[in-house]
């Protein structure tokens, strides 16, 4: 995965043909308002998660990111009338580091990486609204806005 595409998926607002320009503008404004009270959160990446089509690092503790998720969900509802879609249910915050569209055995990858990499702390201090089109290996990735968390300790 290209470095600039590394991300922690928070919420999928909807398909690109379902969200209007007016809703996108409203969503950005709502996110700025809601995230004004959210503090940056430090999480640890290290535990490796395996999926048939991806390898990810879990962001722990998930609770540290709950205020951000709540703010984004509230902004999404206010701007679009939709709930948004979590990547997993229950939500497991993670950073995907590799995708695979080939059929291949997972065992060699699991043997090479194991279940845990050295811990790495990262601070999440903003969200980005990104429009993605196409399959995962050929995304058209267009950042629409970056919204910082405004509440600092």
Task: List each model region and its residues.
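Histidine-dependent nucleotide/RNA phosphoesterase domain, centered on the 2H-phosphoesterase fold
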Residues: 1-153
